[in-house]
């Protein structure tokens, strides 16, 4: 008897429907065709143990399994469930009449329990597109899959439960998730708030500008000055995720297997802070079965690299392409995978190896050569992709104890949202441009060109402060954002002046002076 069940293979965010065909004839052999990897081939032993544990028999027959399309490599243990169901149906132990209505995925434990699977959300989207009536997934993943409308999602604990559903021995209700309620209920529920930060108003203003225009930012200052503290609070002032962004972000985390049990939509912008010992593969993604790296897990959110010069230089260099293209392509011999990687890059660093260069309360023990070598760990092309460079000094205890609580994140976020709304209208219909940080040179001349007074101020600053040529476009982009925060139609000299103040590392004399 020939029986078919349906599952799916995930390649990046692309999903292909897989037909599992099982034929039983007289004999004792087990044949698997269709480019299944080791985990798929080992599934036979897990399936046999699970059947025996649940009171069923593994057929004593010649079993031939084909997984179509045969030229697509099938990876992972998620094919255990559709394979087990197909074998049982081919052996006549369960009815086969409803198998064509369901797509299913799940790894079987030796006791028949269904283990969590990766990539369930994009699989659910594919199942709906293929017009399946239902999707059977492990209980762990049911809410993740149920955010997809117009398909019944059944979260099952075990092989026995799946058999009971398909045999109509028990009634099961599909999981229901109110997508909009799930999306809005935690959108503004932040654990960290800028009101916790006392002082540092200049740096908080720089982060507000960065959030308003989607600009990458680096903070330079001694240990204990609050760089990490403020970076961690940046998501609390960013515009809320749209429903489309939320779904896109959740898909990436679904493929990576980083969604928490019982969670559905990711409703807050991601904040990822990898350690400086991270490998290139962990940062950008990869592996035999290419998985998303930190830059893709930061998609629509923030990637924070603390102590930037401590990262491996080659690892940092691989950031250049995704910072420009806002996606990453991982190539293998027979295929390639592309993951989105549109994130705000936020970095922090000490001004020197000891950390206290220019600090009035500590003595720096570094030589000028050591300081220069330390700064040279960050290449020019990478620094060229960072719009805002701000210095930060430690606040003395006397001033810290007197400082009032900072402005709440909610107030800052209102201004940021208003500025982003201006940019949304400005770039409406322009592909790939949603905020000022993404402006092309042509757009800079159109939307950020200053008047004669502003141009004169910019020329004077570049000459007197020895600003590099690459700072010119960055200053105008940031000035446009500052103007948007002010609600100004044109970029004015005061906007240029503030933007110039955010190019600290571009000053030709930076390494020779105190902070």
Where are these regions (language model features)?
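P-loop NTPase nucleotide-binding/switch module
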Residues: 170-209, 213, 240-295
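Peripheral, non-AAA+ core regions of ATP-driven protein-machinery
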Residues: 1-218, 222-225, 331, 471-472, ...
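Short beta-strand elements
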Residues: 18-24, 283, 387-390
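The Walker A (P-loop) glycine that initiates the GxxxxGKT/S ATP-binding motif of P-loop NTPases
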Residues: 221, 285, 307
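Walker A/P-loop
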Residues: 219-260, 325
């Amino acid at each position: 008897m020939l029986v078919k069940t349906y599952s799916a293979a995930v390649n990046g965010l692309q999903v292909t429907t897989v037909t599992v065909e099982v034929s039983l004839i007289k004999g004792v052999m087990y044949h698997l065709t269709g480019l299944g990897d080791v985990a798929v081939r080992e599934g036979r032993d897990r399936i046999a143990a699970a059947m025996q544990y649940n009171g069923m028999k593994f057929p004593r027959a010649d079993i031939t399994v084909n997984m179509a399309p045969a030229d697509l490599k099938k990876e992972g243990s998620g094919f255990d469930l559709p394979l087990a169901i197909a074998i049982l149906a081919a052996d006549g132990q369960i009815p086969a009449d409803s198998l064509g209505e369901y797509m299913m995925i799940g790894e079987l434990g030796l006791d028949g329990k269904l283990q969590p699977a990766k990539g369930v959300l994009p699989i659910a989207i594919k199942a709906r597109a293929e017009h399946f009536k239902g999707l059977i997934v492990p209980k762990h993943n049911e809410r993740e899959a149920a955010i997809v409308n117009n398909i019944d999602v059944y979260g099952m604990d075990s092989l026995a439960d799946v058999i009971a559903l398909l045999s109509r021995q028990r009634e099961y209700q599909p999981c229901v998730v109110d997508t909009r309620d799930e999306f809005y209920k935690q959108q503004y529920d932040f654990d960290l708030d800028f009101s916790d930060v006392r002082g540092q108003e200049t740096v908080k203003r720089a982060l507000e500008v960065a959030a308003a225009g989607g600009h990458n930012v680096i903070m330079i200052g001694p240990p204990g000055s609050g760089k990490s503290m403020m970076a961690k609070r940046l998501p609390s002032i960013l515009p809320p995720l749209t429903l489309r962004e939320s779904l896109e972000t959740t898909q990436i985390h679904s493929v990576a297997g980083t969604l928490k049990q019982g969670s559905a939509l990711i409703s807050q912008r991601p904040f990822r802070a990898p350690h400086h010992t991270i490998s290139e593969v962990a940062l950008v993604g990869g592996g035999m079965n290419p998985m998303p790296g930190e830059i893709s897990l930061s998609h629509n959110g923030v990637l924070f690299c603390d102590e930037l010069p401590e990262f491996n230089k080659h690892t940092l260099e691989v950031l250049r392409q995704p910072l420009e293209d806002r996606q990453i392509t991982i190539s293998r011999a027979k295929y390639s995978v592309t993951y989105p990687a549109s994130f705000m890059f936020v970095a922090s660093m000490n001004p020197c190896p000891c950390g206290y260069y220019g600090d009035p309360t500590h003595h720096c023990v570094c030589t000028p050569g050591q300081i220069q070598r330390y700064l040279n760990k960050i290449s020019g092309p990478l620094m060229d992709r960072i719009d805002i460079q701000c210095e930060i000094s430690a606040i003395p205890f006397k001033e810290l104890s007197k400082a009032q609580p900072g402005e709440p994140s909610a107030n800052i976020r209102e201004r940021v949202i208003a500025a982003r709304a201006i940019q949304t209208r400005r770039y409406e219909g322009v592909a790939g441009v949603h905020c000022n940080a993404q402006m092309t040179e042509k757009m800079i001349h159109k939307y950020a060109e200053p008047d004669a007074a502003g141009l004169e101020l910019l020329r004077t600053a570049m000459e007197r402060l020895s600003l590099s040529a690459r700072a010119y476009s960055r200053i105008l982009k940031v000035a446009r954002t500052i103007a948007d925060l002010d609600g100004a139609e044109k970029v004015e000299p005061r906007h240029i002046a503030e933007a110039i103040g955010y190019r600290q590392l571009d000053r030709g004399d930076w390494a020779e002076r105190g902070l």
